[in-house]
Amino acid sequence: MNTFSDNIFCPEHRMYGNASKKTHTKGCIHPIEVGMRTLSLTKTYTCRGIEFSSIPLYDTSGPYSDPSVIINPEKGLNPLRDKWKFNSENTEPVSEQGNETAAARVPLRAKKGCSVTQLAFARKGIITPEMEYVAIRENQQLEEWIASFPIGGKTAEPFTAEFVRQEVAAGRAIIPANINHPELEPMIIGRNFRVKINANIGNSAMGSSIEEEVEKAVWACRWGADTVMDLSTGTNIHQTREWILRNSPVPIGTVPMYQALEKAGGVAENLTWELYRDTLVEQAEQGVDYFTIHAGILQEHLPAAGRRMTGIVSRGGAIMAKWCKTNNRENFLYTHFDEICEILRSYDIAISLGDALRPGCIADANDEAQFGELKVLGELTLLAWEHDVQVMIEGPGHVPLNLVEENMRKQLELCHGAPFYTLGPLITDIAAGYDHINSAIGGTLIAAYGCSMLCYVTPKEHLGLPDKNDVREGVVVHKVAAHAADIAKGNPTAWLQDELMSRARYAFAWEDQFNLSLDPVKARVLYAESRAASGQTDGNPDFCTMCGPDFCSMKRSQEK
């Protein structure tokens, strides 16, 4: 293994100067400590009668932004969840072999007859450490502010561990947390919580190294990705995934079909259920938290897909369609779905039911093929729930703005309220180079309607494999989309950050403005460049270079 670049480390001063520190909140039910980032403000701002000289921020960076933690990527992160000692009586070692990192780890699985999923515990009325963790995390230590916030004619209520349990039990939310991913800091995906975003990484046959992919994963977390999907299709798929998992504080998802296809020599016709099953188990033992499985595409859908302008654009969907046509048999992911669920149940892996027939252009949006598959995904949702497996549903894709709402409405109707996870949607087909913005526009709208998680798109979408800088652009732009949707849905903690930004802007508190933004580094750089270009390098003026000292409207409005 080559030495990792120093760039994998993300000290806080790179983003927030000296204004930020890592803080932890202890649980009341379980021995947990929830990490957040507390941002100190240069001024004290009063919002709804509450004074704020600092604000806790939701933090996805894990220990990477904690200067008190020494991290060696070749050993991986500390196994946070092992300390909670929950669920041990229901699990057993798979084998005595450790993984491929320096830190030896014995994979676990559920004992025979036991269910170790968050859904199973929630249905029994049991609050797990993960449930308490996400309740504390969603509140951000802002219970007083939340309780003062008016919404729907009444004040909001802080999240409780019991509310989290109820949402998971009802299938409206999932906590993806494989028992073999102890480095994970639990998070929740559901429409009654903060809108989350996912960042896709992974090598391809065209290039990228293990080190580059681990670095992308770490920086995706640092910039705000709530989950990361490793979509590697090149060489060293197993090793790449192992290193990402051992160094990831966020849930990791995969599409197991990609590795199964590699094992089949890249020939879809050579795939078998047994080969795919073994791949599921291999990845389950490594610690993958959720699988995208394209079990909803059936032979009956293929004629409608064949009439499309751009056919099948999902890689997993195209693989299964090819297999079905060549072998003249039904999708083995569908016919073996019960067995798939039993595997997932043994490790608490959530299933992300893949949209193999998502539209690849706006002309194909909301067509017979797309909604035919969605109906099957709803049926599979009920079947997965019978096995105590957590479920979310994947969605499009390319959808014109006027058809976005119908996607959300159909998903809720056909999939029984399971969380929706969409790729955008992209609302036009002509934004090459700017598809991250294209995606964020559609993503904002569908998230405001109730979508739980947005899959980011980078500027390289449709053009090439993204690098670290593309990952940053994609993550931040989709954080804007998710945050805008949270505002529209009345999320009190999201609103507070905007209100503090507005007050800082009116007070010309430049450092607070930088630090309260979603990309403090870029805000600070653009400000400095603009000041330098105008010859102003000293002090923090009560105006910006856009208006200058004589035309600043905020300055004028404060004059007596």
Curated annotation (Swiss-Prot):
GO terms for biological process: thiamine biosynthetic process; thiamine diphosphate biosynthetic process. The keyword Lyase applies. Catalyzes the synthesis of the hydroxymethylpyrimidine phosphate (HMP-P) moiety of thiamine from aminoimidazole ribotide (AIR) in a radical S-adenosyl-L-methionine (SAM)-dependent reaction. This is Phosphomethylpyrimidine synthase. One of its GO terms (cellular component) is cytosol. Belongs to the ThiC family. InterPro entries: ThiC (IPR037509), ThiC-associated_dom (IPR025747), ThiC/Bza_core_dom (IPR038521), ThiC/BzaA/B (IPR002817). [4Fe-4S] cluster binds at residues 544, 547, 552. Substrate binds at residues 200, 229, 258, 294, 314-316, 355-358, 394, 421. It is an enzyme of class 4 (lyase). Keywords: 4Fe-4S, Iron, Iron-sulfur, Lyase, Metal-binding, S-adenosyl-L-methionine, Thiamine biosynthesis, Zinc. The keyword Iron applies. Pathway: Cofactor biosynthesis; thiamine diphosphate biosynthesis. Pfam families: ThiC-associated (PF13667), ThiC_Rad_SAM (PF01964). Zn(2+) binds at residues 398, 462. The gene is thiC. One of its GO terms (molecular function) is zinc ion binding. Its EC number is 4.1.99.17. The lineage of its organism: Bacteria, Pseudomonadati, Chlorobiota, Chlorobiia, Chlorobiales. It comes from the Bacteria.
